[in-house]
Amino acid sequence: MKKNTDSEMDQRLGYKFLVPDPKAGVFYRPLHFQYVSYSNFILHRLHEILTVKRPLLSFKNNTERIMIEISNVKVTPPDYSPIIASIKGKSYDALATFTVNIFKEVMAKEGISITKISSYEGKDSHLIKIPLLIGYGNKNPLDTAKYLVPNVIGGVFINKQSVEKVGINLVEKITTWPKFRVVKPNSFTFSFSSVSPPNILPTRYRHYKISLDISQLEASNISSTKTFITVNIVLLSQYLSRVSLGFIRRSLSYDMPPEVVYLVNAIIDSAKRLTESITDFNIDTYINDLVEAEHVKQKSQLTINEFKYEMLHNFLPHMNYTPDQLKGFYMISLLRKFLYCIYYTSRYPDRDSMVCHRILTYGKYFETLAHDELENYIGNIRNDIMNNHKNRGTYAVNIHVLTTPGLNHAFSSLLSGKFKKSDGSYRTHPHYSWMQNISIPRSVGFYPDQVKISKMFSVRKYHPSQYLYFCSSDVPERGPQVGLVSQLSVLSSITNILTSEYLDLEKKICEYIRSYYKDDISYFETGFPITIENALVASLNPNMICDFVTDFRRRKRMGFFGNLEVGITLVRDHMNEIRINIGAGRLVRPFLVVDNGELMMDVCPELESRLDDMTFSDIQKEFPHVIEMVDIEQFTFSNVCESVQKFRMMSKDERKQYDLCDFPAEFRDGYVASSLVGINHNSGPRAILGCAQAKQAISCLSSDIRNKIDNGIHLMYPERPIVISKALETSKIAANCFGQHVTIALMSYKGINQEDGIIIKKQFIQRGGLDIVTAKKHQVEIPLENFNNKERDRSNAYSKLESNGLVRLNAFLESGDAMARNISSRTLEDDFARDNQISFDVSEKYTDMYKSRVERVQVELTDKVKVRVLTMKERRPILGDKFTTRTSQKGTVAYIADETELPYDENGITPDVIINSTSIFSRKTISMLIEVILTAAYSAKPYNNKGENRPVCFPSSNETSIDTYMQFAKQCYEHLNPKLTEKELSDKIFCEKILYDPETDKPYASKVFFGPIYYLRLRHLTQDKATVRCRGKKTKLIRQANEGRKRGGGIKFGEMERDCLIAHGAANTITEVLKDSEEDYQDVYICENCGDIAAQIKSINTCLRCSKLNLSPLLTKIDTTHVSKVFLTQMNARGVKVKLDFERRPPSFYKPLDKVDLKPSFLK
């Protein structure tokens, strides 16, 4: 019994992370990291970025400077709630204001004199409007006193049209590990980026590349375009670190394989030969000469000393305040990795590994845009001052330059889906699935331009570094995003940290490292470098590395550093480094701690008894060594046991090899995959397809559906699922339902439900089963004069409009009805006409196939009249609509049967839905049967022994055997009726019933699987996809039907359709469709000399080619299709001559007919 209790403990600890933790300020775990990210930006980082004091221009050897100072940054929340914003049709924005002062500083003997040039106190209500993130319960970071709506999880922005916007998280381009690349055989590069810490603004970026060619080892250089000299990497390391070449040789060779040592000796010897080739070589003189040559090459306006200081001081910005000697040792450690990676490439994290990348969250998006737009703003002010001084001789700034920071345009572009000129960042939230409010903000994707042809296939594979941190099931199965977008697992989150916290944490870690004996942290020749965010701070004695890492991890868990998400990675495998990561954008998740071969969960006997009354933060405080937050880099270089069960089966010696132990399999799924049931009991593709279909499931009504002029599909009578997982419950996906329980039967029905066809009961539909309401936005823009014009002739299209020209509320719109008045008028130039004014209707019509009721109408009056109409329509299931179970058993309505046509059981109950039974075997969805069994068992005993209602926990991925669930169902039925026989009990457990034929009232020979299941209706609706029409608009060029339902399009008649008719021998039909219709008929004159199509000049047809040669062409009129004429014209325009030739033969009636011998063959 103890073993079972222990195996459940890890599951209970995992559940504690998922539930809210008010003591730690966590009210909704799935999106908490997004709330914190945006809160850090709006409350802290925005002030840091906008508060600026720096020189714009300098004159007379820097004795005169034009300065800019931005201060008094204030951020004001809106006065209204998100619902009011939706009603008004406005965006939900915070207002940021600041003061700009531009002055001139003159340095004189008496001191510095300041002369004011310009000042602007920004109080404009439209200066900077920052889209405000709506948090859990309609709260926002600036005003937490807003009333609480618990089921509103937030995580969205509202744009100016009251449309919700959500976005994915992008993988940052800059990597934290250098990128290794094989240029050609025996030629390699090692490129890396250096970014200044967050406390240094503006952020400085430097990108360096180390090149190595085996055939030219003297040219093993490091370079950076226009920011650094091109210099031998060994000599640069020697110049910075002030050590000998022998020291560098010993440092690079320590603990390296023989082949790497050979290459090290060759590189050091080549550097030595380079120094010997220069007479009286001096390393300082050598570097100075290179700097002077670069100064001349760049034609810099700075003095040589200023140029050298700028170049060397800004070298490696991430080690900005670090001595040059440590920079030199850092370069040696990089060169060590480079040389090792040449021989052991597979052991080094590649560029696609998530170990190398940080992730941009909502706050980081806005931070990056604010930083870039501020630099543009300051640059515009600088250019304006220079232009005014050049043209007028005065230092002045135009007021419009000061009042247009440009941040509004950047933020609105962000919500429109453009982040730094790339796509895929944000998108409109589709309201057909409440679940996507969670899934989209927890998605991680690559930049579109990151995916080049050369690396496309390597990126799109499931990378090993994504294991445990990403959901392996919830990935796009088709389309351009395959392999590029991944979903975080339920335990994963993304780190956030304030600048002040970052500096304090860095200081505490440095103090801890320096508390060691000085000689033990100064092993720069053969030690393990210790880096904090890639900045070298010490080099540790190799004999102390295990004790150091173990002690550091223990102190971290105990809160010694004040941050539980610090990552410490011990990189062995000859690369020898201790990496400490504290920055934002890292993927972290909890793991169970293994210390000296013992699972720390077992060492705390009090934990089990107190666990029910504790939150996750309580566990971290009172039992700090049980769980550790581990980032993805630390996880990759640690030994992690897959499960507690496997860990317990190992010997003591094997256990000591592990550092961490993982939680059960259900915690490796994302929140979308957690809505499925029994993934591990089904075939693999069902999980991927199931996640895609769960996102398309229509969910319950949103919070203020009537106030948003937005598209949406909503389930009318949703039901909470009975069979759920813990993640589904804690994320409130279960409470905000996405389906209904229906009674299904697995059987064949008159051959109608073949393949994916399903039979649905008519009375079930009439009672509101899986009924939905569709909200649709219709938007038109009308010129003001057209809107004010009055119609001269009564039009049926305007029958639903009121006298004000707008459609009236609660009117039922049909196809062809106008939604607003739009009458264009024109004046005829005819003096004899009585009325030379003509008018005609140009309004946009309602085009849907179904009638809709007008719910709301919004109007904006500017230079144009913008009308937005929200229509509602109840949509009951019809033929062709799609449904699915949570095991990816998608079906299409093939027949709607009356109750009298359906089979029934002994109680007269008929199934709501009949599904083809062979689909279970072909798709191998055993968990669908388990879900029916568990749902039926719940209906028999919906309460536990304490009288409390309890849903059935059936996790998406679980390690529970099917026999356990069968035993649970057996206990439910025995509790309800203990006198059941073994056969009756078996039938109830396995949901097998005898059904009766409705026509003969006789029982079927076989028992039928019959029971309840949670059924989902998908957004694929028949009436939204039908595009068949008899007549309609055509394109001007090829005169084929338009594409898309919105443009009134139809189905094009192309080559494949033509071939089908040819196969049927329908020659007259082809002629009629492709040629004889009045739109496609085309008369063409062909020149019989050259085969060109004749041109029409002043109503005269002539051949241009023959007329230039003074020939007399013979033009013949032929009838052909318009498309043929367009094809010939386009081919001629591309330089391809297509000659139309006529068949030369005499007419058949001029030639005598051939004689036919009618004699029988035997007489011939």
From Swiss-Prot:
UniProt xrefs under Pfam families: RNA_pol_Rpb2_3, RNA_pol_Rpb2_5, RNA_pol_Rpb2_6, RNA_pol_Rpb2_7, rpo132
Enzyme class: transferase
Superkingdom of the organism of origin: Viruses
Name used for this protein in its record: DNA-directed RNA polymerase 133 kDa polypeptide
Protein function: Part of the DNA-dependent RNA polymerase which catalyzes the transcription of viral DNA into RNA using the four ribonucleoside triphosphates as substrates. Responsible for the transcription of early, intermediate and late genes. DNA-dependent RNA polymerase associates with the early transcription factor (ETF), itself composed of OPG118 and OPG133, thereby allowing the early genes transcription. Late transcription, and probably also intermediate transcription, require newly synthesized RNA polymerase.
Gene3D superfamilies: 2.40.50.150, 3.90.1100.10, DNA-directed RNA polymerase, subunit 2, domain 6 (2.40.270.10), RNA polymerase alpha subunit dimerisation domain (3.90.1800.10)
Catalytic reactions of this protein: RNA(n) + a ribonucleoside 5'-triphosphate = RNA(n+1) + diphosphate
Molecular functions per Gene Ontology: DNA binding; DNA-directed RNA polymerase activity; metal ion binding; ribonucleoside binding
Family matches, as InterPro entries: DNA-dir_RNA_pol_su2, DNA-dir_RNAP_su2_dom, DNA-dir_RNAP_su2_hyb_sf, RNA_pol_132_poxvirus, RNA_pol_bsu_CS, RNA_pol_Rpb2_3, RNA_pol_Rpb2_5, RNA_pol_Rpb2_7
Lineage, uppermost ranks: Viruses, Varidnaviria, Bamfordvirae, Nucleocytoviricota, Pokkesviricetes
The keyword Nucleotidyltransferase belongs to this UniProt entry's keyword annotation: yes
Protein family membership: Belongs to the RNA polymerase beta chain family.
This enzyme's EC code(s): 2.7.7.6
Signal peptide residues on this chain, from the entry's feature table: none
